[in-house]
Amino acid sequence: MSSYANHQALAGLTLGKSTDYRDTYDASLLQGVPRSLNRDPLGLKADNLPFHGTDIWTLYELSWLNAKGLPQVAVGHVELDYTSVNLIESKSFKLYLNSFNQTRFNNWDEVRQTLERDLSTCAQGKISVALYRLDELEGQPIGHFNGTCIDDQDITIDNYEFTTDYLENATSGEKVVEETLVSHLLKSNCLITHQPDWGSIQIQYRGRQIDREKLLRYLVSFRHHNEFHEQCVERIFNDLLRFCQPEKLSVYARYTRRGGLDINPWRSNSDFVPSTTRLVRQ
């Protein structure tokens, strides 16, 4: 269990509780979770973070009424900056989006501006929102993470409790390498409900070579770990930076969707540019 799982900042969340669904616009449904909850135990300070990045959200169940009452549908793309005070809690995001369903808006841009304003207010940070008509995305290919997949290893694993022990002495040699490693075996659990979160992760680094078996064992140790998606990615970045000490590091996870939303956080200390095309499980 995470050290802050019972923090008072989480007590008021609708997550894990029975809720009524509202279909008329209500910005108060949005709830934020302070990023400091997981950053403080990691020794990460808001004014001196070792990374930059965004939380990329895809909104698959977004609908509202136009001025004449005709339903509209769109796919939304949201990027929340890593410097925001709060992350957006996903169940509250879903409930908030449901409140658009029977609400009339004059045009698409009004919807976009409303989303941008409300999400920025909740997160207390910079955010960008784009809305796409379905025909703009039809035929878009399924993407994949570039890099070497480390999953096909003939190893025995019998420990699924989170530990950084596997990263001890996980680098070897003095030669500097630059490589991208990928795993589809990332599984963590919701901080509150403990429901499973499934993801693929891409780790791009420059530095002493990281032992792939030790890295895979470390990633598998998240299997019983309870944290939000964004928190897991920051923990992985921080652990790799601390134990492996790469010159450059980027960590990017794309999680499967739940409630019509998928969350795809990335953190980097280099000029990393994430691919935003959905993966096969998304």
From Swiss-Prot:
Q: What broad class of enzyme is this?
A: oxidoreductase
Q: Which reaction does it catalyse?
A: 7-aminomethyl-7-carbaguanine + 2 NADP(+) = 7-cyano-7-deazaguanine + 2 NADPH + 3 H(+)
Keyword NADP set for record: yes
A GO-annotated cellular component = cytoplasm
Q: Does the keyword Cell cycle apply?
A: no
Q: What is its main location?
A: cytoplasm
Q: Which GO terms fall under biological process for this protein?
A: queuosine biosynthetic process; tRNA modification
Location(s) in or outside the cell: Cytoplasm
List the keywords (alphabetical): Cytoplasm, NADP, Oxidoreductase, Queuosine biosynthesis
The active site consists of C190, D197
- Sites binding substrate sit at I88, E89, S90, H229, E230
Q: What is its EC number?
A: 1.7.1.13
* SUPFAM superfamilies named in the record: Tetrahydrobiopterin biosynthesis enzymes-like
Task: List the Gene Ontology MF annotations in alphabetical order.
Answer: preQ1 synthase activity
Query: Could you say which residues bind NADPH here?
Result: S90, K91, R258, G259
Pathway given for this chain reads: tRNA modification; tRNA-queuosine biosynthesis
Query: What HAMAP family does its record include?
Result: QueF_type2
What NCBIfam families does the record point to? QueF
Q: Subunit composition?
A: Homodimer.
What role does it play? Catalyzes the NADPH-dependent reduction of 7-cyano-7-deazaguanine (preQ0) to 7-aminomethyl-7-deazaguanine (preQ1).
Write down the PANTHER family for this protein, in alphabetical order: NADPH-DEPENDENT 7-CYANO-7-DEAZAGUANINE REDUCTASE
Which family does this protein fall into? Belongs to the GTP cyclohydrolase I family. QueF type 2 subfamily.
Q: What is this protein called?
A: NADPH-dependent 7-cyano-7-deazaguanine reductase
- According to its UniProt entry, this protein's organism is Shigella flexneri
